[in-house]
Amino acid sequence: MVQGREGTFITGISMGGMGSLRMAVKYPEVFQAVASQEPAVEPALAYDDITLRDRIGRPDGAGLEDRILLKRIYGDPIDKDYWAANHPAAIIKKDPSRLLGLGIYLEVGDQDLFYIDQGTEFVHRVLFDAGISHEYRLVKGADHVGASLVPRSLDAFAFIGRQLKPPKWIDDTVLRFRATADENKKARGYPVTPFDPNRIHAQ
């Protein structure tokens, strides 16, 4: 059993993708990285912004079992603050700086039958706009189920492997090239941003 954050990873697919992402962004001090595949996350920051399309494949309260499940989880009426406190995108938006140093991998198929590509893209945009470095893949021609999940899962595990043993992609050659490019940027009045593996460089 690994003790401490380093070497502690969490991953999952679909509902498990949402759960793993939620756990990682709620408790980034616990995990070194998360690999979330096709996470069942609604593209919204508030419960009232969820659309009919976003409810496909999820409990929507239409049937008795759904109503019981929603009441058990979120209360009756829905506790919207509690919902936001457990929604990955809303958690990220509230305080993105907590995620600096957390390895984050998101992926989804662009043919997802539950439209989960919409929610995954939404989470990606929240992270991107906050300047939090992460890896995101929209897999061309892939659905929520099927043969694509095998290579996609291997890609997710490869990401985890890179967190265990980070490749030296920014080597001396790259640093020299960056230094030359930075001088050119300065001369032309462009902003210069230093290399930071935790932030998107343009932020």
Task: Outline where the language-model segments fall.
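Non-catalytic cap/lid and distal C-terminal segments of serine-dependent acyl enzymes
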Residues: 1-203
